[in-house]
């Protein structure tokens, strides 16, 4: 089973409903091939009517992250959720370790005069260690400058104070997502990208 982790803000009713909708659409499309973890569904550590224990929350989610194949980071909102940003960092580091492990493995095999191509060596490494973890980001903010009229907005910002039309994102968090995967701007686009990744890993 391909392990998928859905991260994002979950503290207000709107967020929980959105997460539930997203999880439903994911399960409808690829549910038979994945084990989807949605933190808000894990009431053993995320029942907010009870006293939260930071150790239990950290280890509960961290242990899931260590076995996650595809990590989905929902980063909508004025500021990407701090917990989600931390998890993006953990997944980015896991991917870097995976890539370093592949490089070390290929280097050792070449040193031992193994006559395999680089693609064959990578296939062997994947058989032993699984595929590299991937991050999929989801941001549906309508202020995406890629799809708006830049010239008119730039003119307004040039002549008026505090008229920035753009949403701000922490570029470190955004970079972690883009370097280690892809960013989707709608639920449908996200589910399409996820389906491609799942089909590659089945």
What are the roles of these predicted feature ranges?
Residues 1-202:
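Conserved catalytic or regulatory cores that recognize and/or transform ribose-phosphate-containing ligands
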């Amino acid at each position: 089973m391909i392990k998928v982790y859905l991260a994002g803000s979950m503290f207000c009713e709107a967020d929980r409903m959105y997460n539930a909708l997203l999880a439903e659409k994911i399960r409808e499309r690829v549910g038979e091939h994945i084990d989807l973890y949605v933190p808000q569904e894990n009431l053993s550590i995320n029942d907010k009517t009870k006293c939260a224990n930071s150790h239990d929350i950290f280890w509960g989610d961290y242990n899931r992250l260590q076995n996650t194949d595809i990590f989905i980071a929902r980063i909508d909102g004025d500021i990407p959720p701090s917990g989600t940003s931390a998890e993006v960092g953990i997944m980015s580091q896991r991917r870097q370790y995976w890539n370093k492990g592949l490089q070390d493995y290929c280097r050792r095999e070449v040193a031992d005069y193994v006559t395999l191509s680089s693609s064959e060596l990578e296939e062997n490494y994947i058989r032993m260690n699984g595929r590299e973890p991937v991050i999929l980001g989801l941001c549906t903010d309508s202020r995406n400058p890629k799809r708006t009229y830049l010239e008119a907005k730039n003119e307004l910002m040039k002549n008026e104070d505090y008229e920035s039309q753009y949403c701000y994102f922490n570029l470190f968090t955004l970079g972690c997502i883009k370097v280690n995967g892809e960013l989707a701007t709608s639920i449908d686009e996200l589910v399409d990208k996820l389906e491609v990744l799942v089909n590659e890993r089945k």
